[in-house]
């Protein structure tokens, strides 16, 4: 597993250890090309091969489109799209393609499937997640002959560092008002979907976007 902060990784490693799971970690900043290369080098050195890749790094920025800083736009695109491409490219070329096997799981968002009102001010985030959706489908078509499946999870509202401000500002009642299941996601709700895409239970599923959103997109699609 990997993220920017070693302290967070150590904590996660210890948590998994209490459950009898042996985990290794590599600290890396996926917004930096050199860190991505080092991450792949170190992971292959530790593991020998990489069969499952979960592209989970992401960032957002809130600003009106007409005043959106170009630096902020580039930051979101660099982490949410460019790093995902580079990591998939390197792991595919160096491990999955030679081994004729791979499971790639990209974290998209329902924000990448539709527009949003001016209240959200997340033009860069929405655009980047739309790119993740297209990337997932394109890569699935391109790498299918190598035995590699590529799918994406598209979460709705989940509590996280990224959404904390929105939850506090908007309030839980408003956030769940349009959700058929009348709740936002919790820490368990993505696990089963991720396990499906990571396992051979999904060996004939590729290029798919699975919404984990309590039914939000189902309601929007029918309206």
Would you name each region that the model predicts?
Residues 144, 149, 205-207:
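Short, small/polar-rich loop/turn modules that mediate ligand/substrate recognition or access, typified
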Residues 1-11:
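Conserved glycine-rich Rossmann-like NAD(P)H-binding loop of the short-chain dehydrogenase/reductase
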Residues 93-94, 141-142, 203:
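Alpha-helical segment proximal to the catalytic Tyr-Lys
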Residues 36, 64-65, 69-74, 175:
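Substrate-binding pocket helix/loop in short-chain dehydrogenase/reductase
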Residues 88, 128, 136:
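Active-site helix of classical SDR
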Residues 114, 195, 206-223:
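Short C-terminal tail/terminal secondary-structure segment
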Residues 109:
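Residue(s) in the substrate-gating loop at a strand-loop-helix junction
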């Amino acid at each position: 597993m990997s993220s920017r902060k070693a302290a967070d990784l150590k904590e996660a490693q210890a948590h998994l250890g209490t459950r009898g799971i042996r985990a290794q970690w590599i600290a890396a900043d996926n917004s930096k090309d050199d860190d991505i290369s080092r991450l792949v080098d170190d992971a292959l050195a530790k593991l020998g091969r990489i069969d499952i890749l979960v592209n989970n790094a992401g960032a957002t920025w809130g600003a009106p489109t007409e005043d959106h800083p170009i630096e902020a736009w580039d930051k979101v695109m660099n982490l949410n799209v460019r790093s995902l491409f580079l990591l998939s490219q390197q792991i595919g070329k160096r491990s999955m393609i030679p081994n004729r096997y791979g499971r790639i799981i990209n974290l998209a968002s329902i924000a990448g499937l539709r527009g949003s009102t001016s209240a959200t001010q997340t033009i860069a985030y929405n655009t980047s997640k739309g790119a993740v959706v297209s990337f997932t489908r394109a890569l699935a078509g391109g790498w299918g002959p190598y035995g590699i499946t590529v799918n994406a999870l598209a979460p709705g509202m989940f509590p996280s560092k990224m959404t904390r401000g929105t939850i506090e500002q908007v309030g839980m009642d408003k956030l769940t008002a349009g959700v058929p299941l009348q709740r936002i996601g919790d820490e368990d709700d993505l696990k089963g979907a991720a396990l499906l895409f990571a396992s051979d239970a999904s060996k004939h599923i590729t290029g798919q976007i699975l919404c984990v959103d309590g039914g939000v997109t189902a309601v929007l699609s029918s309206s």
